[in-house]
Amino acid sequence: MPLARLAKEIGVRATLDHPLLELNKLLLDEMKQLRDLGVYVGTYCQPMIPSLYQPVADPMETVRTIKEIGPDRCIIGSDFGQVLHMDAVDGMRVFIRALLGFGIKPDDVKIMLKDNPAKLMWLDEN
């Protein structure tokens, strides 16, 4: 939390990567605290879609996280393209289809896939 507070204080935009990864999993309340400090929460298909690296996955955990944090503070990415995974483009297609299938609205997918990353990289200003 101290780093997120400092980032907010000095105007740095930040993202929290892999909060659902078992190695460094955060509680939803911790993610909400970071969100409230202006941090974007990264959600990736790896914890949602079974793979050789993670043979058991709970897609609803990712969906719950997006709904609880709010799409306006989430970023989505495939995190695929590694050895033994599908390539990044196919991974993203599968991830988006899964999100839509589990009830995430198309407009919210656009926000998380296009709008929020642009904001994070200061590409949203003219």
Residue ranges of predicted features:
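Catalytic beta/alpha-barrel core
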Residues: T15-L23
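Ligand-binding pocket scaffold of soluble enzyme catalytic domains
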Residues: G42-T43, K119
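Histidine/acidic-residue-rich catalytic or RNA/ligand-binding cores of hydrolases
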Residues: M1-A7, K25-L34, S51-R64, G81-R97, ...
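Alpha-helix-loop-beta-strand connector modules within alpha/beta enzyme cores
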Residues: A7-G11, I66-I69
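Structural preference for beta-strand elements that scaffold enzyme active sites
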Residues: R13-T15, G38-G42, R73-I75
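Short, surface-exposed connector motifs at secondary-structure boundaries
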Residues: E9-T15, G101
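Short acidic/histidine-rich active-site segments
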Residues: Y44, I69-A88
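Mid-to-C-terminal alpha-helical segments outside catalytic/metal-binding sites
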Residues: M92-N126
